[in-house]
Amino acid sequence: MAKKSMIAREVKRKKLVKKYAAKRKSLLDEFNAAKDPMERLEIHRKIQGLPRNSAPNRVRNRCWATGKPRGVYRDFGLCRNQLRQRAHNGELPGVVKSSW
């Protein structure tokens, strides 16, 4: 189980990403459309002025059951251990043990 502070930090990051997504996208579109280097520099400074945790690449996928940051399957949002345990218990519909 991950520390509660780490889980809370990730929740905060997700909220910030959602809050600033439109502003960040509009600034990036302006940046890509700008031709003048000075104009690009000014827009870049505005992008840098946004909160650091509002960047989507800072969000880490975590298991929703345990909060573990590694070995998380995107389709289920579960870490590998929880995925295996819940699949064996039949809690994940459509997931069957492989045999050939």
Curated annotation (Swiss-Prot):
InterPro entries, sorted: Ribosomal_uS14, Ribosomal_uS14_bac/plastid, Ribosomal_uS14_CS
Source domain of life: Bacteria
PROSITE patterns, per the entry: RIBOSOMAL_S14
Pfam families, sorted: Ribosomal_S14
Keywords per UniProt: Ribonucleoprotein, Ribosomal protein, RNA-binding, rRNA-binding
Biological role: Binds 16S rRNA, required for the assembly of 30S particles and may also be responsible for determining the conformation of the 16S rRNA at the A site.
UniProt xrefs under HAMAP family: Ribosomal_uS14_1 (MF_00537)
Descriptive protein name: Small ribosomal subunit protein uS14
Natural source organism: Prochlorococcus marinus (strain MIT 9215)
Gene behind the chain: rpsN
